[in-house]
Amino acid sequence: MLVRSLELEEFRCFRHLHLVLPDRGLRLVGANGSGKTSLIEALYMLATTKSFRASLERHLVHRSSGSELGIPPYARLAAELFTETERSTLEIVLMVDPASGTVRKLYRRDGRSLRAVEFVGTLRVVLFSPEDLELVTGSPQQRRRYLDTILSTIDRAYLRALARYTRILEHRNSLLKSLAERDQRAADEQLAYWDEQLVTYGAYLLVARLRFLAEWGPRLRDHFQALDTQAQVLTTAYLPSIDLPESLLSELAAREVADAQLIVGARYRETLERLRPDELRRGSTLVGPHRDDVEFLLGEEPLTAFGSRGVQRLAVIAAKLAEIAVIHRVTDDWPVLLLDDALSELDQQHRAHLLATLSALPAQLILTATESDVLETPVLSSLPLFRLNDGRLEPG
């Protein structure tokens, strides 16, 4: 998959940008605040519908947007994509309500309006950034988001199940709060429907995650070993919130999907029944994929506690390289590779290894850095160099 062109209008610092991207990619150099991360962010949004850095979506819209035309603030992102068999255009329009500050997003593919679940996955990207370290050191929510993002872009059924599970969870939590003062029997009757829905979609998500990790994990291990030949073996462990022993977890990924979902569903149902009093007291669903975690292990010890920052960063790079391989295996296509100042914290040896690995892939590569010398290496010499300054793009 290739991004042939990118167009931004009133997005972040860009009033208007039209960029034609070479098939192999390009290098972007600019000071902090010049717009290079915003350009990467735009491509990421066109792939996932979400920003990897904005806490408030209205901050994505240029502060002066719409004022000259006398219309509400807006931003527009568009990209022209090519594969071996087809060509398509993606577009996202963000519209800000001036009174509330809320943002409405419109999605179009080839001019046709789509829902987010239909839009995601047309463009697939893998992002490398300094903040990726939080995949290892951050909260369980960040690791769940990582799994959900990958699986949603390669499996639209997973994305639909995730959206459905999230809505069910909201309804169930609201009901738990309203039933806090009721007796157990009345609560059981009213929760029965939502429990079954939660179990059905929750089991689907959990089994899909286990099957992904079974393929991703060995690739992660091998890439990490190539990056650090002296280190112990890097593995991962899925930590479910429902009662699933470790021995059973390893079996589930190898079973037929339907059988695995039945086993997980039965365990999930039992756990919900056991925790009913606690959930009613707290007014919240205490178990399910929304409470699970993934642990990185160096040897047999948690990487968070026993790995240096340098080793943790290598683990994240290995995770991203494994992600590329799985996406290619599942989709038979290469994702667009986005490196946002991801080389700055690597030593020369590991920087060279990463660039050699990525450059050997037939994938489009877009790299940013604050200093051009980081990107001026022989392996990247075929990629044109551009400089960004306050949203303006100039040949390097």
From Swiss-Prot:
Coiled coil: none
Top-level taxon of the source organism: Bacteria
A GO cellular component entry from the record: cytoplasm
Binding-site residues for ATP, renumbered to this chain: 30-37
Localization: Cytoplasm
Gene Ontology MF, one: ATP binding
Similarity comment: Belongs to the RecF family.
Protein name in UniProt: DNA replication and repair protein RecF
